[in-house]
């Protein structure tokens, strides 16, 4: 059952249960979320979203891979508001223009925007987690490394000093744990060349691999701690190995 068919009470109960079991973080900058949220993965999605602390994010940027006919490869839908069953959410028009001014491949275009985009599911979850926020949707219609690196570089620069949460939509089936371990090892070794080989080689099992890799690149650039629950013994991740987050590392306090 898709999240749009779940009741408010079901979603809130799942989040509440996970809040009791996890310690919230007030420094999460990135979330990796499945492209579709439903009754089968609500528990694992809640385990991540429930860790959002009291941070008052001004904007949530949702990045996803979605095929379309747009000539430019990084389109952003033109809507001023987007409607969910829980109300309207306003677009951050200024931020959208900032990206459009950054590079020619960012373009305000609706050709890749339809009812199947992941954005709808993510917003419903966010409306149960955050109070007031704006949204920016960025789509990747070409997952070649040139465009993925271009997107990551723009986000690194434009969003670094902004009070923004970035949400990357991607999936990896539960039997691909060795693949996830290999990618994490590549990131930890700071080997961007090997990461691009993984992206371009055609062997990746990740659905939404462009969004996944761009998220890893931004997290690495910002010095964030990347956490995938599937790599830890306390994991309850059963459907998507990539459900996770990246947060600021806590600094030691010396007295």
Annotate each PLM feature.
Residues 232-255:
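Long, Lys/Arg- and hydrophobic-enriched amphipathic alpha-helices
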Residues 1-224, 232, 236-238:
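Active-site histidine-anchored catalytic micro-motif
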